[in-house]
Amino acid sequence: MAVILILISHAYSMTEAGMFSIGYAIALLGMTLAKYGQRNFQVTDIAGNYSFAEYRYSRWITVILTMLFMTLYLLIQCGMGKYDIEKILIVFFLCLWKQIDAIEDVFYGMYQQKGRLDIGAKRYSERLIFSTVLFCVLISLKIRFLMAVLLETILSIVMAAFLIQKDKESLLLEVDNKCRLIHVRRLMVICLTLCISSTLAVYIGNLPKYFIDVLLEDSIQARFGYLIMPAFVIMVLSTVIFQPVIRDMGEAVKERDYKKLSGYVVRQIIYIALITSI
């Protein structure tokens, strides 16, 4: 995001950079809401109490509901005269762009659940590099910013679909694809508290951006985006070191090996402290 934000401010103006900054913040909130806090639950479901089809079905529900909610929010902003049509479309396409992460997440969660986090990490890295390079190229061409966001969204969706399909066929043979609606409903209820906590964490973290969006200009939003970048980097790095051990922590809880679990927690605290100090 840092590289993209800097390129936007150079290729266009601080106004476009500000629109990207608030659009990305709203899209990140939408992505977190769509993920529904389900990844950690899915990965630690070692016993396979819920099938992959049930996780996938519930994810489609949350993605669709999130996009409906985001559309309603943008229409309200338009009706109140706070967003013009271009800003609405930019934010909408950025929200759609980040929903790719939510859809990918259920597949990569299944890979990690089956002990193949390496596949998910590899495919996610490939798609992320593709999306970042593509966005940088589109920005460098200095085409209309709205068109750059639209092309980025469409091509990223195509790339994500290709990468998911690449491994899905072989790995889905090993999973239960039976979908029971009562299990889907139960998943939605069980993960609700996880969804609320994760969404609130993202919302509170980006709260200054929302206030700037209401009270100040988009150019101020861009400047604030530069200032808050170190905190964003720390958050991303913390996720990177935490995500790989979720399954192992789940196994430790299942086996009631609390000594092993405490070791994981202590190591995570040390890693985060080291990253923060750097």
Regions from the PLM with identified roles:
Residues R39, V106-Q113, L117, I139-S140, ...:
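C-terminal transmembrane helix end/exit motif
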Residues G48-A53, F92, L96, M110-C136, ...:
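Alpha-helical transmembrane segments of multi-pass membrane transporters/permeases
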